[in-house]
Structure formats: C-alpha cells, structure tokens
C-alpha cells in the first residue's frame, strides 16, 4: 500500500509531462548525404554499408549527382510546419549558397523523416558543401534550429 502511494504520484507526474514534450517542435537529426548517378545514397539498407558508400562518394566527386538532407523532426499534431535548410558552399574559391524548403505534414507523438534534395544543375553550380543550417517554421516564427559546426 505504501509503495502505491509513492508510485501513483510518480506515474501521474510522468503522464502529465508527455503532452508538453510532444507539443514543442524540434529537429532531432540532420544527415547530409551524397547521391550517386542513380540517385542512391547507399547500395543496401545496412548503416555500415551506407557510411562506407558515403565515404566513397566523398572521395570520388565525379560519381555524385546531388546532395540530400535526411532530417528527423518532431512536432505537434495540430500544426503544419515548414522546414528550411540553408547551405553554404564553395566552388573554385567562390562562395555559394542554396536554400531548400519543404512544407511538412502534421506531426504527432512520434518523430518523422523528411528528405530535401539539391540535384541537377543546382548541385553542379553549388560546389562543395561547407556548412548548413536547418530550421523549422510555424508561420513566420522560427521554432527549432540545428546547424553544422562551421555555420
């Protein structure tokens, strides 16, 4: 009985904090990935193989056809968010910039993955990626941000 008096308030407190965690939009993980000539970022579903293939594409730029940002995000179910990824690069000592945007569906309790791609002539004119910044927007208000070390 005494254990129930201690356990029940802890359970109620933990349950009450769940909606607060799900309500705030956040960017969890951003993975910049090169794409090969067929638009693939990996040859198999294995994470080890993906990392090895990405290292190969980093060493051999002539095999690349684009750059994809796989972004894991979480947001409230009631809000439609917009994701924006800003890129800074360099092409033959000339600084370059690019912006990728996507309107996201409604969030929910679990996280979601979205992919934003820079490919074709835009990628060829962009050059090498130096830094990036990903943001989540609710209307005109920025609600979450993650950026690379060099941003």
Predicted regions and their residues:
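Positively charged n-region of N-terminal signal peptides that target proteins for export
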Residues: 1-6
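Bacterial N-terminal signal peptides
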Residues: 7-17
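A eukaryote-biased signal for short, well-structured alpha-helical docking elements
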Residues: 22-43
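Contiguous beta-strand segments within globular domains
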Residues: 41-75, 111-118
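Mature extracytoplasmic domains of secretory-pathway proteins
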Residues: 61-109
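Short, solvent-exposed, Trp/other aromatic-anchored flexible loops in extracytoplasmic proteins
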Residues: 108-128
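Internal, hydrophobic beta-strand segments that form the core of beta-sheet-rich folds
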Residues: 128-142
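Short beta-strand elements
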Residues: 142-151
């Amino acid at each position: 009985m005494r254990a129930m008096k201690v356990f029940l308030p802890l359970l109620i407190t933990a349950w009450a904090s769940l909606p607060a965690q799900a309500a705030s939009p956040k960017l969890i993980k951003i993975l910049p990935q090169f794409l090969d000539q067929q638009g693939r970022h990996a040859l198999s579903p294995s994470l080890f193989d993906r990392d090895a293939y990405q290292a190969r594409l980093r060493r051999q730029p002539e095999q690349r056809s684009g750059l994809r940002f796989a972004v894991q995000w979480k947001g409230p179910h009631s809000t439609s968010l917009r994701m924006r990824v800003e890129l800074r690069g360099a092409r033959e000592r000339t600084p370059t910039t690019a912006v990728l945007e996507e309107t996201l569906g409604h969030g929910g309790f679990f996280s979601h993955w979205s992919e934003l791609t820079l490919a074709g002539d835009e990628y060829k004119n962009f050059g090498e990626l130096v830094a990036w910044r990903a943001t989540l927007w609710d209307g005109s208000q920025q609600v979450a941000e993650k950026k690379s070390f060099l941003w």
